[in-house]
Regions:
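Bacterial N-terminal signal peptides
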Residues: 7-16
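Sec/Tat signal peptide C-region and signal peptidase I cleavage site
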Residues: 17-21
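Intrinsically disordered, low-complexity terminal regions enriched in Ser/Thr/Pro/Gly
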Residues: 22-270
Length: 270
């Protein structure tokens, strides 16, 4: 049977801070997010062609004489009946260069054209090979069918999408992002999807006189049937200090239905 689920480790990033003494191994601050460093994604939901990132902080790690930690992370997704949809274990070994006993871990759940619809459970266990302690958590994840939706939103420092970024940036930096659109109408054997980008200030006032607009059109009937998602890339410049909102609106011009997504952007001095 073809799996609808591809489980992949995107990375384990060492982001440590000082701690007075080793404590009990714990997992803290579990978040769904838009990319490894992007803003929090409030709902633990999966859509076709989505890419759900989950990040968390592991604390209370034991290190060896050189300051190195040695852990393994087990990730499992099961459906409502307990059937395993995907399972993966990876090792994470690294030097805690800022000291302390903690680091940030992130994993992602990239989906194919089908998702396990309904209630699922994500299970993650972290094992410290040096202290022989383990910590784990579970989160419910809801699989949903593909209505018109923005999915797999991620942010980057570069246009090529190789350097993941936060939406907390320094003055003068560009902020690149990419996303997929699903659930558009194909009944007329054509696709016409529009992406509009606008930014808002702290009071909710629109900054751009007109939104930045990108269009995707496909009129070849065979290509239309084989197109599962529309891929967009765009960027904004962080030209002034403050707190802002990035508003991304997608419109299916075949039906004039729209959906939008808003994320916070903070610009600080270098």
């Amino acid at each position: 049977m073809k799996s609808v689920f591809i489980l992949a480790l995107v990375g384990c990033i060492i982001l440590s801070w000082s701690a007075p003494a080793q404590g009990k191994l714990q997992i803290e601050n579990v978040q769904a997010c838009y990319g490894p460093f992007g803003p929090e994604r409030k709902a633990f939901e999966l859509y076709p062609f989505d890419n759900l990132f989950i990040r968390f902080t592991v604390t209370g790690l034991k290190t060896d004489a050189t300051g190195k930690a040695d852990t393994s992370v087990k990730v499992k997704l099961v459906d409502a009946k307990g059937k395993v949809i995907g399972e993966y274990t990876f090792s994470s070994t690294g030097l805690l260069t800022l000291g302390g006993q903690s680091f940030l871990v992130f994993v992602n759940l990239p989906m194919r054209d089908q998702v396990p619809v309904g209630k699922n459970t994500l299970m993650i266990t972290v094992s410290d090979k040096l202290s022989e302690e383990s910590a784990s958590f579970e989160r419910p994840i809801t699989g949903k069918k593909g209505k018109l939706q923005i999915v797999a939103l991620e942010f980057f420092h570069d246009a090529d999408g190789k350097l993941p970024a936060s939406t907390n940036g320094a003055l003068g930096e560009p902020l690149h992002f990419r996303l997929r659109v699903i659930g558009f109408d194909r009944s007329k054997e054509k696709i016409h999807t529009e992406l509009a980008v606008q930014t808002l200030d702290a009071e909710g006032k629109e900054n751009l006189p007109k939104p930045l607009v990108l269009n995707f059109q496909e009129k070849d009937a065979r290509a239309v049937q084989n197109t599962g998602f529309v891929f967009f890339t765009s960027s904004i410049g962080l030209n002034r200090l403050g707190k802002f909102t990035l508003r991304i609106t997608v419109t299916d011009r075949s039906t004039n239905q729209s959906t939008k997504l808003e994320v916070p952007v903070t610009v600080t001095a270098p």
